[in-house]
């Protein structure tokens, strides 16, 4: 993200934020069924016996959902997901370079690992607080099932916002902020820092040019590292956000209940769809993000030259 040649015009902060938001929305649209499968696998086993477990594996979950609830169910919560990327990814990714440059200001040497981690912590934390209501609605819509005559809690995205705010409280829209903050701090730092370091190593050692293959490989490596480290916090976040009022007194209580009833492997439920989703999301997002920045700056240069 920062390893551009000196001959290139550096993208402005506005270009970075816009490019990150557009790229993240496109990645979300393409990978959303994997995210829905991940959520269903993560909440599976919660208050259920083994005989009621219906989902087995990524493809099995997607197939079961499509057959029993219809193909549109795979995209339930997508509007909230798009809203989340606009308010969340555009900030955590789009502001990363700018904040990193701020921490490195006055220094001629490349950004240190501490500078990169600090930038990831700051942009991730701010983005989580702003985008948390969209995360709550997205998870609730993805988790609700229409089977066995169960009346869905919500009929749509804006209906979910209204019902949550009026029947539970406005603060419920920020439910699960703590585990989501932990998850996204891990994700933001691991994802952006790993991508940044991997891309820098490939380009600086002349293994690959700063182009699509380099961006693709860097995104895949970042996706695996991020999924592995963030999985426990991701599962706890999903369980806590989807829980009924009073089901879990606190986030630690949710984690302890999972551990005692389901064992340590519960914290890695949905790992495969989570990795497939995050890896593919990373590839689409980072490749589109890099290309959008370049094309927008080229367009800007062309306009400047003609005026």
Swiss-Prot record:
Belongs to the mitochondrial carrier (TC 2.A.29) family. It catalyses: H(+)(in) = H(+)(out). It is found in: Mitochondrion inner membrane. It comes from Phodopus sungorus. This is Mitochondrial brown fat uncoupling protein 1. May undergo sulfenylation upon cold exposure. May increase the sensitivity of UCP1 thermogenic function to the activation by noradrenaline probably through structural effects. May undergo ubiquitin-mediated proteasomal degradation. Solcar repeats lie at residues 11-102, 111-201, 210-295. InterPro entries: Mit_carrier, Mito_Metabolite_Transporter, Mitochondrial_sb/sol_carrier, Mt_carrier_dom_sf.
């Amino acid at each position: 993200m920062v390893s551009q040649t000196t001959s290139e015009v550096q993208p402005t902060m506005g270009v970075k934020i816009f490019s990150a938001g557009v790229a993240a929305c496109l990645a979300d649209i393409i990978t959303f069924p994997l995210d829905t499968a991940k959520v269903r696998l993560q909440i599976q086993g919660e208050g259920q016996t083994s005989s009621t477990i219906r989902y087995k594996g990524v493809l099995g979950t997607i197939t079961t959902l499509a057959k029993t609830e219809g193909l549109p169910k795979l995209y339930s919560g997508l509007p909230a997901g798009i809203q989340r990327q606009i308010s969340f990814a555009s900030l955590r990714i789009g502001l990363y370079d700018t904040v990193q440059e701020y921490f490195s200001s006055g220094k001629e040497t490349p950004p240190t690992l501490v500078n990169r981690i600090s930038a990831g912590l700051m942009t991730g934390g701010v983005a989580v607080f702003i985008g948390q209501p969209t995360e709550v609605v997205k998870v609730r819509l993805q988790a609700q099932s229409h089977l066995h005559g169960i009346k869905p809690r919500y009929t749509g995205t804006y209906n979910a916002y209204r019902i949550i705010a009026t029947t539970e409280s406005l603060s419920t829209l920020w439910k699960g902020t703590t585990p989501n903050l932990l998850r996204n701090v891990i994700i933001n730092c691991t994802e952006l820092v790993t991508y940044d370091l991997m891309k820098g190593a490939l380009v600086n050692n002349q293994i690959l040019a700063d182009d699509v293959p380099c961006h693709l490989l860097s995104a895949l490596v970042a996706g695996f590292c991020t999924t592995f480290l963030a999985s426990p916090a991701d599962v706890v976040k999903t369980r806590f956000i989807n829980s009924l009022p009073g089901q879990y007194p606190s986030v630690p209580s949710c984690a302890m209940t999972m551990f005692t009833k389901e064992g340590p492997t519960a914290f890695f439920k949905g790992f495969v769809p989570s990795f497939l989703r995050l890896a593919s999301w990373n590839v689409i997002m980072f490749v589109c993000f890099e290309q959008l920045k370049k094309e927008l700056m080229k367009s800007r240069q062309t306009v400047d030259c003609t005026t």
